[in-house]
């Protein structure tokens, strides 16, 4: 009697377990992931006297969630990227790259659409090029005579040259009576006469 009761209880427990398990939602435990492959194209010109090397260029996904470097041919790859919207950033010495918004479609089996965030331009291929070159050092301006003339010291020297050489000639054309009356007015007001400052008036 006891074995029959045990077998009956075991069968009832098994049926209950299978029935309860069938009512739970089934999850695969992992999302569908995709691979993003792109290329970084850098001009052949040098930056700050050094050629840009692919090994020094870093590509970042979602602010550091994934980081990769370029292969010698300039390509990069991100593996196990879930469907959704992602952000790709390129860090290269001497260049500024626009961040790229990448939309990975789950409906179309990993179809990728890329858009530059700076210019809002869509990319048919994930080929990233710098928007501009960056200068980290201020370039020294070449020597220029005009820069010296326009400086405060140059303007002061020019004014002194006018006073010393041109003012005496201008004074010669002024009526002596008018000059005398002007000097008297300046003395009465406590202002020194301009002619007293000139070598010709001494």
Curated annotation (Swiss-Prot):
Coiled coil: none
Cross-referenced Pfam families: EMC7_beta-sandw
Bias (Polar residues): 182-202
Major localisation: membrane
Compartments (UniProt record): Membrane
Annotated TM spans: 148-168
Region: Disordered, residue numbers: 179-202
Membrane topology term: Single-pass membrane protein
Keywords: Membrane, Signal, Transmembrane, Transmembrane helix
Signal keyword on record: yes
Protein's recorded name: ER membrane protein complex subunit 7 homolog
């Amino acid at each position: 009697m006891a074995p029959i009761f045990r077998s009956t209880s075991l069968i009832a427990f098994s049926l209950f377990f299978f029935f309860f398990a069938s009512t739970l939602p089934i999850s695969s435990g992992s999302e569908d992931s995709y691979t993003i492959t792109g290329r970084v194209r850098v001009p052949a010109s040098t930056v700050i006297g050094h050629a840009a090397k692919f090994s020094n260029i870093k590509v970042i996904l979602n602010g550091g969630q994934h980081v990769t470097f370029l292969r010698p041919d300039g390509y990069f790859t991100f593996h196990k990227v879930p469907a959704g919207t992602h952000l790709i950033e390129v860090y290269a010495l001497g260049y500024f790259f626009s961040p790229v918004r990448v939309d990975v479609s789950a409906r179309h089996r990993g179809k990728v659409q890329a858009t530059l965030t700076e210019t809002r331009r869509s990319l048919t291929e994930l080929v990233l090029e710098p928007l501009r070159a960056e200068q980290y050092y201020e370039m020294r301006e070449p020597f220029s005579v005009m820069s010296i003339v326009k400086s405060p010291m140059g303007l002061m020297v020019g004014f002194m040259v006018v006073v010393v050489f041109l003012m005496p000639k201008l004074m010669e054309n002024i009526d002596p009576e008018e000059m005398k009356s002007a000097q008297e007015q300046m003395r009465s007001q406590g202002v020194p006469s301009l002619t007293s400052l000139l070598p010709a008036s001494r």
